[in-house]
Amino acid sequence: MNEQTAAALRRAQARLDSLDLYPRPVSLRRVRIWHVRWLFRLPWFRRFAGYTMWPLILLREPLHETSDDLVCHELCHVWQMQHHPLRMPLSYLYRGYSANPYEVEARAAVDATRR
């Protein structure tokens, strides 16, 4: 992992560590950030700037063009999956996106920790 990625994850981790959402703090072990612009050209992904799949954070734009708020939001999803590895991703099948409690929680985590 390069230093820019490590620094972005540490900043997001520090923000989330100030919250008491889950019994264990978010772990950065195995977390990776990939810039995959082509993925966000696919119809399902066009509306997103970032997407998380377990310890993998996928970004539309390069990390140096991505806000700390987005990295924090996506790392919150990593944290959620560390505690609910099946329930969290499956919730999108029956709750959808915007009203999904995990999305609401990730947006609230960003708002609560915004400087």
Spans of features found by a protein language model:
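Polar-ligand-bearing catalytic/cofactor-coordination segments
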Residues: 56-76
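Anionic, Ser/Thr-rich low-complexity intrinsically disordered regions
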Residues: 1-5, 9-18, 24, 72, ...
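Post-HEXXH active-site segment of zinc metalloproteases
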Residues: 40-46, 53, 65, 69, ...
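Auxiliary, metal-adjacent structural segments of Zn-dependent hydrolase domains
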Residues: 1-52, 56, 107, 112-115
